[in-house]
Design a protein with these regions (language model features):
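Extended, structured, electrostatic nucleic-acid-contact surfaces
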Residues: 1-3, 195-220, 228-233
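Gly/Thr-rich phosphate-binding beta-strand-loop-beta motif of the actin/hexokinase/Hsp70
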Residues: 2-20, 96
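Nucleic-acid-processing active sites and adjacent nucleic-acid-binding tracks
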Residues: 24-48
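Short alpha-helix plus adjacent loop in nuclease-associated cores
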Residues: 71-120, 160-165, 261-270, 274
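Phosphate-backbone recognition surface of nucleic-acid-processing proteins
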Residues: 82, 213-222, 226-312, 353, ...
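Glycine-rich, often acidic, oxyanion-interacting loops/wings at catalytic, nucleic-acid
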Residues: 123-213
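Low-complexity, acidic/Ser/Thr- and charged residue-rich accessory regions of DNA metabolism proteins
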Residues: 260, 304-361
Length: 361
């Protein structure tokens, strides 16, 4: 037991502290500014600092670890259950102390500066992609108001909108035509920035052994590999097993059990929704390519064959979620063993397929 435990309710400029003794009783409370907060830890011998995993939370554990202070991040949704009565900064700090005593709450792993920078690139790309989509949809709406329909698809739609705006004979009024062309220039600029960012991700992936390993997994491309490295740094040792890793993305089924009755429902959708989205899109791509290959008479084996069998028994969406779950488990195995995924050329039956992905105890 640490002699002194400090719970910190983080904020932008005001920090609420609750200091506990060896018996977890609150003996001091402080409300400090950012400067006072840094000075307070410089003059104290602190054993453990607990904080919620929120904005700026990963910066402070790194700052505290430098002088040798242990810092622990707790999931905010689990800490919330320990808040009594009204929600205040002091109540949040006291709830952090109670949550820190619970042995069943897994702390959040602190990200490095490099991990957060890589994750930031993905967030910026998503922001630009959303902005590009909103601009394209706005131009579609303007054209539709004047009786011009634009085909679906970003690339096809942009080409059609460009032709419509360039043709003076179309029904687009001159009053809005110039502004719409400026909107088209914004879209082209966004596309150039997205392409440049993806080139930076490609250069990073070439230098990362973990990314090279992940790229060997079917359905895992540049975005999924780099996002997974940003989330885990390529180290999966803190996960108990492959199922625990898949549950971190919300790809494992919810369980409703009572007595001897056990029911597994839909996927939980907890955890990292961005990586869950990437894995699911990758699984859909693998399923579609496998179905095309099967229709062309080519041999389909391994996880692709397994996914097609699942689709035959259920439906496409369930098969895509099942394959995304399988892909997450394969990613865990490749990162754990630091070896690329080598899919065999022999078709797998149901029994062998199950044995192939059993993780050692």
């Amino acid at each position: 037991m640490h002699a002194t435990t400090v719970a910190v309710d983080l904020a932008k400029s005001v920090f609420q502290l609750a200091v506990a003794d060896a018996s977890w009783r609150v003996v001091e409370t402080h409300r400090l500014t950012r400067t006072q907060f840094e000075r307070w830890f410089a003059n104290r011998d602190v054993g453990l600092v607990v904080m919620e995993s929120c904005g700026s939370a990963h910066h402070w554990p790194r700052w505290l670890n430098a002088p040798g202070i242990e810092a622990r991040l707790l999931p905010a949704q689990h800490v919330r259950a320990y808040v009594r009565r009204n929600k205040t900064d002091a109540a949040d700090a006291a709830a952090l102390l109670e949550a820190a005593r619970a042995s069943d709450i897994r702390p959040v792993r602190v990200k490095s500066v490099e991990q957060q920078a890589l994750q930031g690139l993905h967030r910026i790309r998503s922001l630009w992609m959303g902005t590009r989509t909103s601009r394209i949809n706005a131009l579609r709406g303007f054209c539709r108001e004047f009786g011009i329909t634009i085909p679906v698809g970003a690339r096809t739609g942009l080409e059609a909108i460009g032709r419509v705006l360039a043709d003076p004979a179309t029904a687009i009024p001159q009053l809005i035509r110039g502004t719409a062309q400026l909107l088209m220039e914004e879209i082209r600029l966004l596309q150039a920035r997205i392409a440049q960012l993806e080139r930076e991700l490609t250069d990073m992936a070439r230098m990362s052994p973990a990314c090279k390993t992940l790229l060997s997994v079917p359905g895992v491309g540049l975005l999924t590999a780099t996002a997974m490295v940003a989330a885990t740094s390529g180290d999966v040792s803190h996960f108990k097993d492959a199922r625990h890793f898949a549950s971190w993305f919300g790809l494992t089924p919810r369980e409703y059990s009572l007595g001897s009755t056990r029911y597994l429902g839909r996927i939980s959708k907890r955890g990292d929704r961005y990586l869950r989205m990437l894995l699911t899109h990758g699984a859909r791509s693998v399923l579609r390519a496998a179905k095309v290959a099967q229709g062309a008479g080519r041999e389909v084996f391994g996880v692709r064959r397994w996914a097609l069998d699942v689709q035959t028994r259920s439906n496409h969406n369930k098969a895509a979620c099942a394959l995304a779950n399988k892909m997450a488990r394969i990613c865990y195995a490749t990162l754990r063993d630091k070896e690329p995924f080598a899919e065999g050329t022999v078709p797998l039956n149901k029994k062998i397929s199950r044995q192939a992905f059993v993780m050692p105890v």
